[in-house]
Amino acid sequence: MKREVKFSLVFRDMWQSAGKYVPRVDQLVKVAPAIVEMGCFARVETNGGGFEQVNLLFGENPNKSVRAWTKPFHEAGIQTHMLDRALNGLRMSPVPADVRKLFYKVKKAQGTDITRTFCGLNDVRNIAPSITYAKDAGMISQCSLCITHSPIHTVEYYTNMALELIKLGADEICIKDMAGIGRPVSLGKIVANIKAAHPDIPIQYHSHAGPGFNMASILEVCEAG
């Protein structure tokens, strides 16, 4: 049986490399029509920590910038998503709970559909409040498994974490292979295990290309569901 695979466009190196202080929002909105015209992306990352930092460095209002950047994608029926650092929100240090709760309402009002929440420690306790806040704001809560390779980080470890996040209310799971070092076969097994328990839960795979595993990993996770 054929399976539909959807693609998400995620920007990273523009913000987290030596040239991270570009582009401005006026440049982003010029790029948006070309992305839409490509016709291959179901989702596009439009805001999150990296974006807001760039806006502020340029003296731009992040509220206006995010609205301008999400608008063309919504008009084309493309969902928008953002990155959320759990207890840290969009920052690199913890944010009070009341600020985090308000943050989701603001993001929803700006036009953000999905929040991808991750904790670098894979501590579900840090992610749990984000699930509640996102859903209360009317957003889709996508929770991440931060992938690495070690004797501790086994297929069973990640499967159990995913099942716990789904039990807490996560709408989707992201296999966040942040360094691209996840082993393709192991990633496929993680996806298969999640799908066996929750066939209808959407799973998104996020990879980096550096180590060279990502194309094999993409094939494995797609084959697994």
Regions from the language model: what does each represent?
Residues 18, 183-203, 220:
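Active-site/ligand-binding-proximal alpha/beta "capping" segment
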